[in-house]
């Protein structure tokens, strides 16, 4: 029998796959989350100590007291990981620091251990638990400190150059040329000054000294001419100092002294200026004479200063071979020159540089000075005058065609700040704030009784750490949809965040794939949308070195023998640029030599065919180019990169299913990614399994000790999916360290299992799979193939209010006994109860405002105590769409010793679990970016069936393949069918997987037709379809975008306070917005009444909508609408601007716009006051008139009486 395609490989203890890989793995994959764990470990071991030694000792202003750092230790954490989760606490350990306070006057020394706050600890999975939730600190990609040179072209097409010295923290120093070939410097983005001014300020004042140091060049002459000696009373150095000060502090009186202090503080004070180790390394590397002199012609004879021997003659071209003999002499300080700055310069120490004269490539007659910075050691973290002079020399040499400009997007110039460093920077900020406080306290308090404890205020330190974990852009809520999402999140690299880029400013170049990403950052996996290219993923084999640069492993090629050795070198991007690297799939002979004379290789950005004697290194593995999620896509090499990007991103959104299956067609990456994700339960020591059940596994170690492993059951993950582990070991099984004991969510037999292997066919069916829609068999619903479990957490807290404490109780006003049937005697729902939208979970009442009680109420109050008081129902109810089964209830009270936030007496958490079957409207996807929405679930009997009667599970649209160019799915379909027939699992690693021949050979081996197509019968009629069809097994996943979370409808619900219009969005139980364009649509059809009710009764006619509701309930005709509230708001806004706005009818009579509150008679408005005043005036006038009439009447009577008397 012919040998079968592929060979069997074992993944873990429980799974074998037939692998089609041709290249044997030379190097194991590293631990995939070591970027997190190693960095944090470094921080605990070294980073913290570095920080303390940086800030301390702190001296007081007089220099009498000194506070020194002795040591620190982290004590035992207060909570375990599980307890921190349950109590909404932090998983952290108390940090204790031993400090020593020395009084230099009395010689007294006091040492004391000071508590420095709780420090968050990293869990074994590489996460932090902050306030009970798991968070990940994402690594940041930033520009590395160092010295950079760039070319620029001005608007007239003239070429110029620029240079920047970037520190880790401190002032930037920039150099540039202008159109007249004059060189300028800028300090910290201020106005520019001629380059020679800064040189003079450093203490090299005369023109002769400047020409002696830098040599003669046109640019330098132009600059010196521009920089005239204006004030003869100052020396050139003093004048230079004053010029610099004027630019840095415009408007302040300038003196040479203040300028000296300022420049010293800006560049030469280690507290304010820090290049960091990486900056010093990059500066030395860039200014290194060995690389700068390559291929130039010497303009002087170089002599060994010790023996006087000639090393290299004048006129020699400095090739690689010559440089190899010259290198040791250069490193030992060949041609060192010491310059002595003038007494009034910024720096008074002598400056030693190396100067070597060469001929200019542009003008072979002219000599040019190349200045090196004299190799300072690593501890020098500030910039030195020699560095400034050497970088100026490099800058001036660029005009002569010596040296090269830097590519800012090259990964040799970008570095990673991982957790440890980000934390260290944050800690430094806290310590620096604390330092100020300590200094102040030293000067205020009595020195005799002072102790370190009294000096230290830990608040700023604690606050800065808390702020970092709680609100930094890089501290993110962990994506825990499935283990792959979890793993990818920990390996993410972000260019955003503090000190990084912003989305709006990031251009195309920064986001683009760069050749230096090869083997370091994945070219595929990045989000679609505004963050594309700014958020990346670490490649599978990549590591981060001590300087923060990403390294990737290569196999060394022995140049003498031509053998590819198994010796692995990790190279950073800038070192790799010097070598030629062959691809991993270059054919090799048995003895490790190349099988062909010419191989494909990479030299910087070029892909070339190279003869094998020029090759220095070879790739370790074909999958070193891509990230973990991308490496899980079979036949990646047959997919278009845009679709592969979607495939890699969508795998992270797969929902864990009830009984997942590992893919039949895998890539061999499934085991490693599941093992390292943190979701699996791993064995810590070799031993034998002694006990297994659903909640615990016990392993007896070889040395007799017993290890207990608790299994997590149905815990809610960060994304609301179910986090559940299942044992996969048996009693008596021998296990080794690192073996998988229990599967986590989305795992099967220790492998990542995000979805299911389903029988698929590419064919259209009645138009139901138009536009990528998916038709599915009811079997997948019935057999719970795509059923997932979702857990939601709801909480209710009883607080103290001004009117008295809230109470959790069964006795709720206006709630019938039927609604309380599942509540216990405390008023809390029982576990296992089935609840629907709006059902009570926790009964709670809040006291209302106390009104004056009548005599009867007082009597009732005296008899029944509190019960008669007025309370409001504030119970926790199941929100819209949250129904399910109560899975767990947790109760936290003060009495039980739980830590609750201030003012809270009791906290109840209810967990509701939902079992969601697959539905029309759910989103599904394959691994090749082929996504779609389920459009129809059909009975099994209507689905097309195979000749043996097997009904198809899923029908996909064949039109989804050609234009998308993800052919990988077709190959997966065929190979999957063959694997199903043969009953095997296969592995086809990326870029080294099954070839077309392998696929067809396996298809034939499985006894399928040679073109892998088959006759298919219509399930409704039993007739065969016209053509033969591709049927196979595809691995399909159900994504987190489920219709249950998105579908939403509202009849009545909450309204916005000001406009009285319905709220929007599912979360607020809002309505559908009927916007401007929708109004136009109704206007176009003249649908006046429909439009009127949409704008009034259905929206913000407050009175009208209540009356409409009543009318509908009573079955009466709907009343006419009133005035919309938004119109009233408009009127009020205009009135508030002081405009007298009134509403008139057709007859110009004013219409009363009654306010909503006018129903309350006791409310006094401005109109009412005016009316009242008018009424008062009218009453007074009436009274006066009445009095007048009365007076007149009295007069008449009096006259009458007088007349009568006269008659008598």
From Swiss-Prot:
Pfam families: RNA_pol_Rpb2_1, RNA_pol_Rpb2_2, RNA_pol_Rpb2_3, RNA_pol_Rpb2_45, RNA_pol_Rpb2_6, RNA_pol_Rpb2_7. One of its GO terms (cellular component) is DNA-directed RNA polymerase complex. GO terms for molecular function: DNA binding; DNA-directed RNA polymerase activity; ribonucleoside binding. GO terms for biological process: DNA-templated transcription. The keyword Transcription applies. Its EC number is 2.7.7.6. PROSITE patterns: RNA_POL_BETA. HAMAP family: RNApol_bact_RpoB. DNA-dependent RNA polymerase catalyzes the transcription of DNA into RNA using the four ribonucleoside triphosphates as substrates. NCBIfam families: PRK00405.1, rpoB. This is DNA-directed RNA polymerase subunit beta. It comes from Enterococcus faecium (Streptococcus faecium). The lineage of its organism: Bacteria, Bacillati, Bacillota, Bacilli, Lactobacillales. The gene is rpoB.
């Amino acid at each position: 029998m012919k040998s079968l395609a592929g060979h069997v490989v074992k993944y873990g203890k429980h799974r074998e796959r037939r692998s089609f890989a041709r290249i044997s793995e030379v190097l194991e994959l590293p631990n995939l989350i070591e970027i997190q764990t190693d960095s944090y470990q470094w921080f605990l071991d070294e980073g913290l100590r570095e920080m303390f030694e940086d800030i301390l000792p702190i001296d007081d202003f007089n220099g009498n007291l000194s506070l020194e750092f002795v040591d620190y230790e982290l004590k035992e954490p207060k909570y375990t990981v599980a307890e921190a989760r349950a109590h909404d606490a932090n998983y952290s350990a108390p940090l204790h620091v031993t400090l020593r306070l020395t009084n230099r006057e009395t010689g007294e020394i006091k040492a004391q251990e000071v508590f420095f706050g709780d420090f968050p600890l990293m869990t074994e999975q590489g996460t932090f638990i902050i306030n009970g939730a798991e968070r990940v600190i994402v690594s940041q990609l930033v520009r590395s400190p160092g010295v950079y040179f760039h070319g620029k072209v001005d608007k007239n097409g003239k070429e110029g150059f620029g240079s920047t010295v970037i520190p880790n923290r401190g002032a930037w120093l920039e150099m540039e040329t202008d159109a007249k070939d004059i060189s300028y410097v800028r300090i910290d983005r201020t106005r520019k000054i001629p380059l020679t001014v800064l040189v003079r300020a450093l203490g090299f004042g005369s023109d002769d000294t400047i020409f002696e140091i830098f040599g003669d060049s046109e640019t330098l002459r132009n600059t010196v001419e521009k920089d005239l000696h204006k004030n003869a009373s100052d020396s050139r150095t003093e004048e230079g100092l004053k010029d610099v000060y004027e630019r840095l502090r415009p408007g302040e009186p300038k003196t040479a002294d203040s300028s000296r202090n300022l420049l010293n503080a800006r560049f030469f004070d280690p507290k304010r200026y820090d290049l960091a180790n990486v900056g010093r390394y990059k500066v030395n590397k860039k200014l290194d004479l060995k690389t700068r002199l390559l291929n130039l012609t010497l303009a002087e004879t170089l002599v060994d200063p010790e023996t006087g021997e000639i090393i290299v003659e004048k006129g020699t071209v400095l090739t690689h071979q010559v440089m190899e003999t010259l290198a040791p002499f250069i490193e030992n300080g060949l041609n060192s020159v010491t310059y002595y700055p003038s007494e009034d310069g910024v720096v008074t120490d002598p400056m030693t540089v190396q100067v070597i004269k060469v001929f200019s490539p542009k003008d072979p007659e002219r000599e040019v000075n190349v200045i090196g910075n004299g190799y300072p050691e690593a501890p020098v973290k500030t910039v030195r005058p020699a560095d400034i002079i050497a970088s100026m020399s490099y800058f001036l040499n660029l005009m002569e065609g010596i040296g090269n400009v830097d590519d800012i997007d090259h990964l040799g110039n970008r570095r990673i700040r991982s957790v440890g460093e980000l934390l260290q920077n944050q800690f430094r900020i806290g310590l620096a704030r604390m330092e100020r406080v300590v200094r102040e306290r030293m000067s205020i308090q009595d020195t005799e009784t002072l102790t370190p404890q009294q000096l230290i205020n830990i608040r700023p330190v604690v606050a800065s750490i808390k702020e970092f974990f709680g609100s930094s852009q890089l501290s993110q809520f962990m994506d825990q949809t499935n283990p792959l999402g979890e793993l990818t999140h920990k390996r993410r690299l972000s260019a955003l965040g503090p000190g990084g880029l912003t989305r709006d400013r990031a251009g195309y170049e920064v986001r683009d794939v760069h050749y230096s990403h090869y083997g370091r950052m994945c070219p595929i996996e990045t989000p679609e949308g505004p963050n594309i290219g700014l958020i990346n993923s670490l490649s599978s084999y990549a590591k981060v070195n001590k300087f923060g640069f990403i390294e990737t492993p290569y196999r060394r090629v022995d140049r003498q023998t031509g053998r590819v050795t198994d010796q692995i070198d990790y190279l950073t991007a800038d070192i790799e640029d010097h070598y030629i690297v062959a691809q991993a799939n270059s054919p090799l002979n048995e003895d490790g030599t190349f099988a062909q004379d010419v191989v494909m290789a990479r030299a910087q950005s070029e892909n070339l065919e190279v003869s094998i004697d020029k090759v220095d290194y070879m790739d370790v593995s074909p999958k070193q180019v891509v990230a973990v999620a991308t490496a899980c896509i079979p036949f990646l090499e047959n997919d278009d990169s845009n679709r592969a990007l979607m495939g890699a991103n969508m795998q992270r959104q797969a929902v864990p299913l009830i009984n997942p299956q590992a893919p039949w067609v895998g890539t061999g990456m499934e085991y490693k990614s599941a093992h390292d994700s943190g979701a699996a339960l791993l064995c810590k020591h070799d031993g034998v399994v002694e006990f297994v059940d659903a909640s615990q596994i016990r392993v007896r170690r070889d040395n007799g000790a017993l290890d207990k492993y608790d299994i997590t059951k149905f815990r809610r993950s960060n994304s609301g999916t179910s986090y559940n582990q299942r044992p996969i070991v048996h009693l008596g099984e021998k296990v080794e360290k690192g073996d998988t004991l229990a599967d986590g969510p989305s795992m099967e037999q220790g492998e990542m299992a995000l979805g299911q292997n389903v029988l698929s066919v590419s064919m259209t069916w009645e138009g139901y799979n138009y536009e990528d829609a998916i038709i599915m068999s009811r079997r997948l619903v019935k057999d719970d193939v795509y059923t997932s479990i979702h857990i939601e957490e709801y909480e209710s807290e009883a607080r103290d209010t001004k009117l008295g404490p809230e109470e959790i109780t069964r006795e709720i006003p206006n709630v019938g006994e039927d609604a309380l049937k599942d509540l216990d005697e405390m008023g809390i729902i029982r576990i296992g109860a089935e609840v629907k939208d709006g059902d009570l979970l926790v009964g709670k009442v809040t006291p209302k405002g106390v009104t004056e009680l009548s005599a009867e109420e007082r009597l009732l109050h005296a008899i029944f105590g509190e019960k008669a008081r007025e309370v409001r129902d504030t119970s926790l109810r199941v929100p819209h769409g949250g129904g399910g089964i109560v899975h767990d209830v947790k109760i936290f009270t003060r009495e039980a010793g739980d830590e609750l936030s201030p003012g809270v007496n009791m906290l109840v958490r209810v967990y509701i679990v939902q079992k969601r079957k697959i539905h029309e409207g759910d989103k599904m996807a394959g691994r090749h970016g082929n996504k779609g929405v389920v459009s129809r679930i059909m009975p099994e009997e209507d689905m097309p069936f195979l000749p043996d009667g097997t009904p198809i599970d899923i029908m996909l649209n064949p039109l989804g393949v050609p234009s998308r160019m993800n052919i990988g799915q077709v190959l997966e379909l065929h190979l999957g069918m063959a694997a199903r027939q043969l009953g095997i699992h296969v592995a086809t690693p990326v870029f080294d997987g099954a070839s077309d021949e392998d696929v067809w050979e396996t298809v034939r081996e499985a006894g399928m037709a040679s073109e892998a197509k088959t006759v298919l019968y219509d399930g409704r009629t039993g007739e065969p379809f016209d053509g033969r069809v591709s049927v196979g097994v595809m691995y399909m996943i159900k994504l987190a975008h489920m219709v249950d979370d998105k579908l939403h409808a509202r009849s009545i619900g909450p309204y916005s306070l000001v406009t009285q219009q319905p709220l929007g969005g599912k979360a607020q139980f809002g309505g559908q917005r009927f916007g401007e364009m929708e109004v136009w649509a109704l206007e176009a059809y003249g649908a006046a009444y429909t439009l009127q009710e949409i704008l009034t009764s259905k929206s913000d006619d407050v009175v009208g909508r209540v009356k409409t509701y009543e009318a509908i309930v009573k079955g009466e005709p709907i009343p006419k609408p009133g005035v919309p509230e938004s119109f009233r708001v408009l009127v009020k806004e205009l009135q508030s601007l002081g405009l007298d706005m009134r509403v008139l009818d057709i007859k110009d009579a004013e219409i009363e716009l009654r306010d909503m509150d006018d129903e309350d008679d006791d409310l006094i408005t401005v109109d009412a006051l005016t009316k009242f005043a008018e009424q008062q005036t009218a009453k007074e006038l009436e009274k006066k008139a009445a009095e007048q009439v009365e007076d007149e009447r009295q007069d008449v009577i009096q006259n009458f009486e007088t007349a009568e008397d006269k008659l008598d």
